[in-house]
């Protein structure tokens, strides 16, 4: 899910809300291992309205153009795909009626659709709608804001030719009959279900979309999801009501969901306590002062639900900008940064990181965090700086300065690097200006980056941020580094079924990137979400945060 910018998401929330979130570290032990789920003695209850505040406004409910966590999360209430992410972030069959028939070479997947599934306007879903929806992400005329979605869908035969305007259709997306679709891949892709469950591949009605402009459909969406959009006031609120045609029996429990878009973040916590709101759509980072305040108010504990982190933060070291082409200098930077201090600066809502894959991924390598390739060693870092031949030239570090705690974090990193003899100049820019393509044109040496996954698999991180394919013009790599051997390991992994063999190859590829020190891991985000106790069945969804169809209002 691509926020602003996708590779380093952190929406800002002021102090009062941050106080709530600061309780995460103190409460995890008391809430226990099931803290991401709120238990309820009573079963589901039908009816009622749930109101959730979101930090930003929405410009499109079109899944092919939705950018940012808030947009993607709410689109999850309107649409379905061939697969859907379950509460653990694993893809499960959704619009697909049965597991696909997969060819011996693992490049042809044939799906049969559920019959009788209808869009909220009553039209039945057919294979033509599915083919249209996937193809549309690649449409060069649409120019979707989710270019990251386009890059993931360039796995089908003929996808690149279509996306570049050289073909009128995608040869690898084939409709066999009204309920059967065949997808032919360029190469085996073991995690295709993850890609098909992602929001940009949600299914939309071809007849409706082709009859209207993209802008119109973005504010008048038609989907198959548990809810449908009743009304939308830009920058004010979006009201969703139960979809009478929803195909999962007994769902949803709620009659209505209201996404409130204009609440002053500073009063959200107070409004939740008063029962005027039921929760906040996402999370952010507190300061140490916020933590101290929260610990003095234990009454707020019942409103906080911790969640496992889906994001890691790191520094990109631009190998195309001397002296960052010097391995010894990059190694010095990797060993100079005190990650324990960063955790303190971020109020405890971070975990030291020495790798790029987050703990929720099956390819996460625990040994790298226990025995880092480049451990914290400022003395050795200083020696490497001298050995590199560095002569005090300014090194520019770009970062998004819209979040105060990120500013504090970069100041701490700057101090660490200065202590080993590096002349680091911070250049904080606004969220809008912090764009990787623009940064490439400014001769940066380093930038604060990272990745927040669309699904918990290493291919999401590697393919979107680390591969050779994304280090050129228009790509998201700020390091501009290409390791063909690592790419070959990932290609080999993608040809294997999910499991230990595939995971091991991803770990080997990651180790090569880490040894090159083009990406310097800093921390994993420690997250939480604020929820009213009256919300029944709540759990934190690792992709959408809120999965409204499964919640109810306690009476």
Question: What kind of feature is each model-predicted range?
Answer:
Residues 86, 241-245, 307-332, 345, ...:
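A bilobed periplasmic-binding-protein/Venus flytrap-type ligand-binding module shared by bacterial periplasmic
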Residues 227, 324, 348-387, 401-408:
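Structural transition elements
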Residues 230-241, 258-321, 407:
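Extracellular/periplasmic solute-recognition and catalytic clefts
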Residues 233, 334-366, 405-414, 435-555:
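Detector for C-terminal structural segments
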């Amino acid at each position: 899910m691509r926020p602003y910018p996708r590779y380093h998401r952190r929406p800002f929330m002021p102090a009062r809300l941050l106080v709530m979130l600061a309780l995460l570290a103190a409460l995890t032990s008391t809430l226990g291992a099931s803290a991401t789920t709120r238990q309820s003695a009573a079963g589901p209850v039908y009816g009622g309205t749930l109101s959730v505040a979101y930090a930003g406004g929405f410009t499109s409910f079109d899944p092919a153009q939705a950018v940012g966590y808030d947009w993607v999360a709410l689109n999850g209430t309107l649409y379905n795909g061939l697969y859907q992410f379950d509460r653990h972030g694993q893809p499960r069959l959704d619009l697909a009626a049965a597991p696909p028939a997969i060819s011996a070479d693992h490049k042809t997947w044939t799906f049969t659709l559920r019959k009788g599934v209808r869009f909220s306007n009553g039209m039945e879903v057919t294979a033509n709608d599915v083919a249209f929806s996937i193809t549309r992400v690649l449409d060069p005329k649409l120019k979707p804001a989710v270019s990251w979605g386009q890059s993931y869908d360039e796995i089908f035969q003929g996808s690149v030719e279509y996306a570049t305007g050289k073909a009128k259709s995608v040869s690898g997306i084939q409709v066999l009959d009204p309920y059967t679709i065949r997808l032919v891949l360029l190469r085996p892709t073991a995690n295709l279900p993850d890609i098909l469950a992602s929001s940009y591949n949600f299914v939309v009605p071809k007849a409706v979309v082709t009859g209207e402009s993209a802008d119109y459909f973005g504010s008048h969406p038609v989907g198959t999801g548990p809810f449908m959009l009743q009304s939308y006031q830009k920058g004010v609120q979006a009201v969703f009501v139960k979809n009478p045609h929803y195909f999962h029996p007994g769902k949803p429990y709620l009659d209505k969901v209201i996404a409130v878009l204009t609440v002053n973040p500073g009063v959200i916590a107070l409004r939740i306590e008063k029962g005027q709101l039921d929760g906040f759509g996402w999370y952010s980072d507190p300061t140490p002062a916020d933590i101290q305040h929260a610990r003095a108010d234990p009454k707020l504990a019942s409103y906080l639900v911790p969640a496992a982190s889906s994001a890691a933060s790191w520094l990109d070291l631009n190998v195309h900008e001397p002296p960052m082409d010097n391995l010894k200098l990059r190694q010095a930077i990797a060993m100079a940064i005190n990650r324990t201090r960063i955790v303190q600066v971020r109020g405890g809502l971070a975990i030291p990181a020495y790798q790029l894959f987050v703990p929720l991924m099956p390819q996460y390598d625990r040994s790298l965090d226990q025995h880092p390739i480049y451990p914290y060693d400022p003395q050795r870092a200083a020696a490497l700086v001298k050995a590199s031949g560095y002569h005090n030239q300014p090194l520019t570090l770009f970062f998004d300065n819209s979040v105060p705690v990120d500013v504090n974090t970069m100041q701490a990193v700057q101090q660490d690097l200065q202590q080993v003899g590096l002349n680091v100049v911070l250049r904080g820019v606004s969220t809008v200006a912090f764009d990787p393509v623009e940064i490439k044109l400014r001769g940066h040496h380093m930038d604060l980056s990272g990745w927040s996954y669309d699904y918990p698999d290493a291919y999401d991180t590697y393919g979107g941020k680390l591969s050779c394919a994304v280090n050129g013009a228009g790509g998201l790599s700020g390091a501009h580094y290409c390791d063909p051997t690592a790419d070959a390991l990932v290609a080999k992994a993608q040809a294997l079924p999910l499991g230990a063999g595939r995971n091991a190859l991803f770990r080997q590829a990651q180790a090569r990137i880490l040894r090159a020190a083009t990406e310097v891991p800093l921390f994993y985000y420690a997250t939480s979400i604020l929820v009213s106790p009256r919300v029944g069945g709540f759990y934190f969804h690792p992709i959408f945060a809120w999965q409204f169809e499964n919640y109810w209002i306690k009476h």
